[in-house]
Amino acid sequence: MAKKSKIAKEQKRQELVNKYYELRKELKAKGDYEALRKLPRDSSPTRLTRRCKVTGRPRGVLRKFEMSRIAFREHAHKGQIPGVKKSSW
C-alpha cells in the first residue's frame, strides 16, 4: 500500500489539472508561452502518474483496469474481474 500522503498529493495534482485545463488549452492555441509558464507546475498533465485504484502503487499499472499487476493478479484469481480468465495453451 502506498503512503496516504502520496495518494493525496496525486489527487491534488489531478484537481489542479482539471481546474486549469481550459485556460491551458487556450494559451497553447494562442502560443502565449509566457503566461503558460506562470501557471502552477502541478497543473500540467505530464506531472500526473497513473496509480493503482486498489493499492495506490505507482508502478506496473495496467491502463485498462487501472490496477497494479499484483492487485490485478489477485483479483483475477479470485474471479472478481469480469471477462478475465487464466489462459492456457
Swiss-Prot record:
Q: What organism is recorded for this protein?
A: Staphylococcus epidermidis (strain ATCC 35984 / DSM 28319 / BCRC 17069 / CCUG 31568 / BM 3577 / RP62A)
Family statement: Belongs to the universal ribosomal protein uS14 family.
A Gene Ontology annotation in the biological process aspect, one of them, is: translation
Task: Please report the name of this protein according to its UniProt entry.
Answer: Small ribosomal subunit protein uS14A
Question: Keywords in UniProt for this one?
Answer: Ribonucleoprotein, Ribosomal protein, RNA-binding, rRNA-binding
- Report if keyword Metal-binding is assigned: no
Its biological function? Binds 16S rRNA, required for the assembly of 30S particles and may also be responsible for determining the conformation of the 16S rRNA at the A site.
Q: Which GO terms describe its molecular function?
A: rRNA binding; structural constituent of ribosome
The top of its lineage is: Bacteria, Bacillati, Bacillota, Bacilli, Bacillales
Keyword field contains Mitochondrion: no
How is the quaternary structure described? Answer: Part of the 30S ribosomal subunit. Contacts proteins S3 and S10.
Gene Ontology CC: cytoplasm; small ribosomal subunit
Please indicate which superkingdom the organism of origin belongs to: Bacteria
SUPFAM superfamilies xref list: Glucocorticoid receptor-like (DNA-binding domain) (SSF57716)
